[in-house]
């Protein structure tokens, strides 16, 4: 089994641990190490046992020296070595096959080069990187090769938009598009400005970098953060080149989401039950079918995404990277 280690146990690291435990039967990798430069092991245990959003109620978690001991309902025990060290002093650097950089502090190749020693062959960054290759699961993950040592999974908004936009462009052609997000944010990140706040969104830059058919002249992102801890909301607009009926669009999307190239990435719901029912969804976005509209060649899609739980696509990418052909490629033959 491929070994991984997490650096950074904030919201993303917490969600990743829970998602991995809940989907361990599908995982090609083990989480063997966790480091955080701020939190002690006792503080981490307290967070795991008391967080009101990410609930580990199917697991009994305790401490044994410098290890988190996790026992599931099946009685199986998992031990994870925990360290509370600055980045340059992490004692297990070079031991895992894959380094999961989840601190949000190290988002460039230069920041992550230190991890590529010993057994470590790949580094996966849990945030947008502007110089590492962005690998979006369900869009370009099959382009990953042995030379891609340090990669980013994108972001929650990038994963929600890019595979869908790519599909729509291939099928109908996209003339222009905009993406609108109401995105949750912890209160402390807004400091004294504790209300709605418009911000820059990574999709504004990453979208055109990944998709050749959008640019600053035909693509706009409106990104508003709001201080609460629930599921976030999105609205997409696509002006299509091809003249297509509403029903044809609905049928094509339904097929793509259920059994086509977007299966497992997106879902179509028959009614709008509000955002909170989509807490911990495995989908990058869930769209509401009755709220889907077409007006003058524009397709409007409304839905929800659990941005904190975009670890679902990070998990998928780590799982893909953990396959033998990626982590241990066959040596090239020479004549």
Regions found by a protein language model. Give the residues of each.
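Short intrinsically disordered coil segments
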Residues: 97, 251-254, 320
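N-terminal Rossmann-like NAD(P) cofactor-binding subdomain of oxidoreductases
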Residues: 1-189, 305, 323-334
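C-terminal substrate-binding/catalytic lobe of Rossmann-fold NAD(P)-dependent oxidoreductases
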Residues: 18, 23-91, 173-176, 181-302
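Electropositive phosphate-/nucleotide-binding environments in soluble metabolic enzymes
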Residues: 6, 10, 14, 105-106, ...
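NAD(P)-dependent Rossmann-like dehydrogenase/reductase catalytic/cofactor-binding core
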Residues: 282-335
């Amino acid at each position: 089994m491929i070994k991984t280690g997490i650096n950074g146990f904030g919201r993303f690291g917490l969600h990743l641990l829970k998602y991995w435990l809940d989907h361990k039967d599908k995982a090609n990798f083990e989480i063997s190490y966790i480091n955080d430069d701020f939190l002690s092991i006792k503080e981490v245990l307290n967070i795991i046992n008391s967080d009101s959003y990410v609930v580990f109620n199917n697991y009994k978690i305790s401490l044994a020296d410098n290890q988190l001991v996790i026992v599931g309902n099946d009685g199986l025990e998992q031990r994870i070595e925990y360290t509370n060290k600055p980045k340059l002093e992490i004692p297990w650097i070079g031991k895992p096959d894959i380094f999961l950089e989840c601190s949000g502090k190290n988002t460039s190749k230069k920041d992550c080069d230190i991890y590529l020693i010993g057994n470590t062959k790949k580094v996966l960054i849990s945030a947008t990187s502007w110089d590492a290759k962005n690998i979006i699961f369900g869009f370009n993950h099959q382009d990953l090769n042995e030379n891609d040592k340090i990669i980013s999974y994108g972001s929650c908004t990038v994963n929600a938009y890019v595979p869908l936009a790519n599909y729509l462009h291939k099928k109908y052609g996209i003339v222009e598009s905009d993406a609108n997000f109401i995105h949750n944010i912890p209160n402390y990140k807004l400091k004294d400005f504790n209300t709605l706040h418009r911000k820059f969104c990574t999709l504004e830059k990453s979208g055109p970098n990944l998709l050749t058919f959008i640019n600053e002249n035909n693509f706009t992102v409106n990104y508003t953060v709001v201080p609460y801890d629930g599921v976030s909301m999105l609205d997409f607009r696509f002006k299509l080149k091809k003249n297509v009926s509403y029903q044809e669009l609905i049928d094509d999307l339904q097929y793509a989401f259920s059994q086509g190239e977007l299966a497992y990435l997106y879902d179509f719901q028959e009614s709008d039950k509000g955002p909170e029912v989509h807490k911990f969804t495995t989908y990058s976005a869930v769209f509401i079918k009755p709220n889907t509209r077409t007006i003058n060649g524009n397709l409007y899609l409304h839905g929800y995404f659990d941005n904190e739980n975009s670890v679902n696509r990070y998990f998928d990418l780590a799982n893909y990277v953990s396959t033998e052909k990626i982590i241990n490629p066959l040596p090239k033959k020479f004549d």
